[in-house]
Amino acid sequence: MLVLVINSGSSSLKYQLRELADDGADGPRPVLAKGLVERIGVPGSDVPDHAAALERVEAEVFRVIGDRPIDAAGHRVVHGGERFTAAALVTNEVIRAIERLAPLAPLHNPAAAQGLRAMTERYPDMPQVVVFDTSFHQTMPREAWQYALPESVYREHGIRRYGFHGTSHDLVAGMAARHLGVAREEFSGIVLHLGNGASATAIRDGASVDTSMGFTPLAGLVMGTRTGDLDPSVVTHLMRTQGRSAEEMDTLMNKESGLLGLAGHADMRQVVEAADAGDRRARTALDVASYRLAKYVGGYHVAVGGAQAIVFTAGIGENSAPFRARVVQRLGALGVELDAAANEAGLSGAGDDGVAVISAPGSAIPVLVIPTDEEQAIARLTWELTRG
């Protein structure tokens, strides 16, 4: 089965063509084609809209597969609000619902809807599926998602914690459960999705019960350019005393902070290199980021009733042995012990199931490194919803 995975941005369209076994068997499947169409709708661009972008995708894809038909398309959508608790088959009403959720994700949902409409017009008979970053976290109990604001703020404006990276957390939790030999619905653990954007999720009995991101992906951990958790009064203080606008504060917190603000580098590799060379700012950035993450791990160990595993995934989680070590070294109170050699080996020391164990044999909680593959997860969900 050929599945085209689409991630539509406001001025870009990222795609992968994945081939799945007809029986939906698990396991890595080949990426037949992938690419990125940029500058959509930008003045002077030769790609005026998402329909034109799809023409480019089509040309590249069919250069690879010839006259083989694409069986289905799966779309990543950032925000599903409270309506979408799982992936859904695309209909006009689903697209309209995504558009109505635009106030919760003004940069992402309108672009996703444009991509969906362009795809539907070009391939009206092709089954399509939408997969939401937020859906996995809709199992959070109210005490985890509700802010201590007046109830009317939630009812009238939808202000609550939603969480993101759900597709990745869901996929990796399933792989961790299989590695441990427990049923998915019996797995309780902590998944750390650490990339330029980063989030931690507490999983109890296979379901998300808490996650570090909140109303937006700004909350939680220290990220490449995002603050993570911040006293909201800092925002009003800077607006009052410096005359900063809401847009300027958005830029400061989302694009100029995090590792970039602390160390001058948004890339974890550069921060680690600078710290090793004696850069004080870089060392401070690593201390702040690892301390923040370790606090979340400790809290989520309580939230899940005792974690069966702590899992690192995504770009930093999979590839930065120095940062993993800094985090795990802070977890001694939980009885967690690192195997330094296994940590250095990382995924090169993974077993046949693709999972690397980086904790020492005597560690109270296994520490795992598991590669995420959100496009593969979207492709598989697309297969599941369209096979019948």
Swiss-Prot record:
Sorted UniProt keywords: ATP-binding, Cytoplasm, Kinase, Magnesium, Metal-binding, Nucleotide-binding, Transferase
Gene3D superfamilies membership: 3.30.420.40
Residue numbers annotated as active site: 133 (proton donor/acceptor)
Catalytic activity: acetate + ATP = acetyl phosphate + ADP
Location in or out of the cell: Cytoplasm
Binding, substrate: 76
Entry GO CC: cytoplasm
UniProt-listed Enzyme Commission number(s): 2.7.2.1
Domain of life assignment: Bacteria
Residues involved in ATP binding: 14, 193-197, 267-269, 315-319
UniProt enzyme class: transferase
UniProt record similarity statement: Belongs to the acetokinase family.
Protein name, entry field: Acetate kinase
Organism (species): Micrococcus luteus (strain ATCC 4698 / DSM 20030 / JCM 1464 / CCM 169 / CCUG 5858 / IAM 1056 / NBRC 3333 / NCIMB 9278 / NCTC 2665 / VKM Ac-2230) (Micrococcus lysodeikticus)
Gene from which the chain derives: ackA
